[in-house]
Amino acid sequence: MSVLTAAEIMTLIPNRYPILFMDRVDELNPGESITCTKNVTINEEFFQGHFPGNPVMPGVLIIESLAQAASILILKSEQFQGETAYLGAIKQAKFRKVVRPGDVLSLYVEMVKQRSNMGTVKCTASVGEKVACSADLTFIVAAADDKI
């Protein structure tokens, strides 16, 4: 059973098809951690060109999936409700496993540091028991209508 459905996710973050990379939130501990699921299907638009005959999810889109999960974690904190989280930096990104159509990508994000309008999270994307990607992300939070 999910904590948040895709429809509920879309009330929190501005991403939409074809750039919404999350199907559900499975576990949420506001201000601490979040676990989400992305079902990777052959119908994803990026598979048309990455790579024909050998479809692989681009690493940058795995990072984007983690950033979207981080956004939900951040925006579910009382102090940031109604605002938007923006990716500010990517550090220590490592790619260890190829993600292919049919894989279920499990996204885990843990809050490391948070102060005023910015913070850092530690992220892991896994397929089964194997880590596909890990990274530390820094975010900035601003009003949804701010031009930053």
Swiss-Prot record:
Domain of life: Bacteria
Primary localization class, coarse: cytoplasm
CDD domains named in the record: FabZ
Record InterPro entries: FabA_FabZ, FabZ, HotDog_dom_sf
Entry's localization field: Cytoplasm
UniProt keyword list: Cytoplasm, Lipid A biosynthesis, Lipid biosynthesis, Lipid metabolism, Lyase
Biological processes, Gene Ontology terms: fatty acid biosynthetic process; lipid A biosynthetic process
Reactions performed catalytically: a (3R)-hydroxyacyl-[ACP] = a (2E)-enoyl-[ACP] + H2O
Function: Involved in unsaturated fatty acids biosynthesis. Catalyzes the dehydration of short chain beta-hydroxyacyl-ACPs and long chain saturated and unsaturated beta-hydroxyacyl-ACPs.
Family in the record: Belongs to the thioester dehydratase family. FabZ subfamily.
Protein name: 3-hydroxyacyl-[acyl-carrier-protein] dehydratase FabZ
Species of the source: Levilactobacillus brevis (strain ATCC 367 / BCRC 12310 / CIP 105137 / JCM 1170 / LMG 11437 / NCIMB 947 / NCTC 947) (Lactobacillus brevis)
